[in-house]
Amino acid sequence: MLFTQLIILLTVTSQALSVTISDLNNIASNQVTKRLGGGSRGGSSSGSRGGSSSGSSSGSSSGSRGGSSSGSSSSGSRGGGSGSSSSSGSRNWGSNQYHCSGNSCGYGNYYAPSTAAAAVGYGTGRYTGGTQYGNNQYHCSGSTCGYGNYFAPSAAAAAAGYGSARYYAQHHNSTSSESETISGSSSLNIPSTHFYLIGFAAAYSIVL
């Protein structure tokens, strides 16, 4: 009689545990799905950052990040062709190519970072000093971006083509877009039959 009662008690307990584990599985699955967002997290970031560099523009248009930038500033107007120097000092640079110094970028006459850089043609194709990067492709250093001659973060980066599509591809594994999709669910996956076996084993050991 006692053995029969023990078997009944353990069977009921096993069924209750089975229901509880099933509920835990469902709860865990829902929680993981909520945390992962259940779908796409991300997107694409494609498009060109920049544009053509033609037209009349000049000055130290700081904050500009490429584009067909035009306008005027305190350094005067340089109508689209000859970028001859008319303002101050030996550090002035006179080409009409987009270039930057520090956090300021612009077309036309613009200060080179040093007298030596201006003397050897800062902003022209022949400038190769230091870590200067000299083609007319959109590129960035730190948080500042621009066309034309611009300082690469290192000599190695300049030599590897810093700012070019191949450089970006080598360092980002993608040239135009990045996306990330994370979805799914998880559960404890504990079979309820295990609890029946555990219950009967416990009952058998008690009887013995």
Curated annotation (Swiss-Prot):
It is a lipid-anchor; GPI-anchor. Residues 33-93 are annotated as: Disordered. Disulfide bonds: none annotated. The keyword Cytoplasm does not apply. Induction: Repressed by HAP43. Down-regulated during oral epithelial infection. Up-regulated in response to galactose. Residues 186-208 form a propeptide. Its main location: membrane. Residues 1-18 form the signal peptide. Residues 36-53 have a biased composition (Gly residues). It comes from the Eukaryota. It is found in: Cell membrane. One of its GO terms (cellular component) is side of membrane. A lipid is attached at S185 (GPI-anchor amidated serine). Keywords: Cell membrane, Glycoprotein, GPI-anchor, Lipoprotein, Membrane, Signal. Glycans are attached at N173. Residues 54-63 have a biased composition (Low complexity). Belongs to the PGA37 family. Predicted GPI-anchored protein which may have a role during host infection. This is Predicted GPI-anchored protein 37.
